[in-house]
From Swiss-Prot:
This is Exodeoxyribonuclease 7 large subunit. Bidirectionally degrades single-stranded DNA into large acid-insoluble oligonucleotides, which are then degraded further into small acid-soluble oligonucleotides. HAMAP family: Exonuc_7_L (MF_00378). The lineage of its organism: Bacteria, Pseudomonadati, Pseudomonadota, Gammaproteobacteria, Lysobacterales. Its EC number is 3.1.11.6. PANTHER family: EXODEOXYRIBONUCLEASE 7 LARGE SUBUNIT (PTHR30008:SF0). It comes from Xylella fastidiosa (strain 9a5c). InterPro entries: Exonuc_VII_L, Exonuc_VII_lsu_C, OB-fold_nuc-bd_dom.
């Protein structure tokens, strides 16, 4: 009997086989026809991939199968990617898929992705190279098919939004083997002419094969090198081509591209109206400022006018004269009042007035009073007043043998011999008469 080193169970054998398959085939691509398509309520997808000689079971679980962009069906040729494994419970050999696409588009998508990565690495799609669209384009070139809904939609939107724009259709094939070369030639001619403010490349929706002309490398390079802003509108919103990546702006549809190219005339009219109002307001403000400035300059000029200055000086002079006259009148009135007060006081001190008053008082004395005593008192008072008057009367001094001497030239009273010199003429007042004498001798 042969020696048995190790005896395996079915599960152990299947586990070893699974590990061997998964390590030997980590990821495989396989192309074939779909068969035995099953999609139960769990959402998982179960199919077989087959060719004329063989078939292999495949499974795609719900997290992946729910994102499929097509409906798997019997006989459909597909390209699948997955991991080779073994279902241990039944010992079934199968592939767990993570990607599934229709075989015809699969090769195209791989070629597209490889070219996109290469051009992107060159910086062909760098946002820094993108040009902005003109704000108010005057002439636009449209490269598209001359027939179909695309050009009609573009014309309709452009005319509705901005009728002033000039549109030039550059008719071209948008599908087929020669389409890419024709579009590239028209784009190069339009850009080099310098006649256009923007260039629109447009096409309606279609399959990947229908849109393949816009994945041409030479077309993408021509778009990226154009000096004129280029906007692309190719296929539907979910479709992306190399022309979209190279263009300055990518629009989801041709109609949206037309809206992006030109401003809305209604918004422009509204904006122009606002600008007009702002301009009118600014003009009125400037005019008001100019008028105010002119008024200020006029007032300053008027203030510096010599005639105005002289008139102002005359007014000030008249005012000063009036105030001086008032001041003089006030001083004169005050002096006259003081003079009247002094006159009244001097009149009250006059002995004659006092004597007259006393005499008048004597007339009204009561006869019943002791007349003799009263008369004596009044006589004594009268004698006192007379003596006081005589004491201050300079003529009384002269009457006693003295004389009043004045200088003849200035009538100055001479009190000291030092006030005169030999030869001076003096006027001498005597008790009776006056003498004019000349000084012969002067001694102190």
């Amino acid at each position: 009997m042969q020696h048995r080193d190790e005896i395996l169970t079915p599960s152990q054998l299947n586990t070893l086989a699974r590990d061997l398959l998964e390590s030997a085939f980590p990821l495989v691509w396989i192309e074939g026809e779909l068969g035995n398509v099953s999609r139960p309520s769990s959402g998982h997808l179960y199919v077989t991939l087959k060719d004329a000689q063989a078939q292999v079971r495949c499974a795609m679980f719900k997290p992946k199968s729910q994102w499929l962009t097509f409906q798997p069906r019997e006989g459909l040729r597909v390209l699948a990617r997955g991991r080779l494994t073994l279902y241990e419970a039944r010992g079934d050999y199968q592939i767990v898929l993570d990607h599934l696409e229709e075989a015809g588009e699969g090769a195209l998508r791989r070629a597209f992705e490889q070219l996109r990565i290469r051009l992107e690495a060159e910086g062909l799609f760098d946002p820094a190279r993108k040009q902005p669209l003109p704000v108010h384009p005057r002439r636009i070139a449209v490269i598209t098919s001359p027939s179909g809904a695309v050009i009609r939609d573009i014309f309709s939107v452009l005319m509705r939004r901005f009728p002033l724009v000039e549109i030039e259709l550059l008719p071209s094939l948008v599908q087929g083997d020669t389409a890419a070369a024709q579009i590239t030639h028209l784009l190069r001619c339009a850009d080099s002419s310098g006649r256009y403010d923007a260039i629109l490349i447009a096409r309606g929706g279609g399959s990947l094969e229908d849109l393949w002309a816009f994945n041409n490398e030479q077309l993408a390079r021509t778009i990226a090198a154009a000096h004129t802003p280029v906007i692309s509108a190719i296929g539907h919103e979910t479709d992306f081509t190399l022309a979209d990546f190279a263009a300055d702006i990518r629009a989801p549809t041709p109609s949206v591209a037309a809206e992006l190219l030109v401003p809305d005339q209604r918004a422009l009219r509204q904006h122009l109206g606002q600008l007009q109002q702002r301009l009118l307001h600014l003009q009125q403000h400037r005019l008001d400022q100019a008028i105010q400035r002119a008024d200020q300059l006029g007032l300053r000029l008027q203030a510096r006018n010599p005639e105005m200055h002289l008139r102002l000086l005359a007014q000030r002079q008249a005012e000063a004269g009036r105030r001086l006259e008032q001041c003089l009148h006030h001083v004169l009135d005050r002096a006259q009042g003081q003079l009247r007060n002094h006159h009244t006081r001097l009149y009250a001190l006059n002995p004659r007035q006092q004597i007259a008053g006393l005499q008048q008082h004597l007339k009204h004395l009561n006869p019943q009073q002791p007349l003799q005593r009263r008369l004596q008192q009044e006589q004594l008072r009268l004698h006192g007043l007379v003596r006081a008057l005589e004491a201050v009367n300079p003529l009384a001094t002269v009457a006693r043998g003295y004389a009043l001497v004045h200088r003849a030239d200035n009538n100055t009273l001479v009190r000291d011999s030092a006030q005169v010199c030999v030869g001076d003429v003096l006027d001498t007042k005597l008790a009776h008469g006056q003498l004019r004498v000349r000084v012969e001798v002067s001694s102190t």
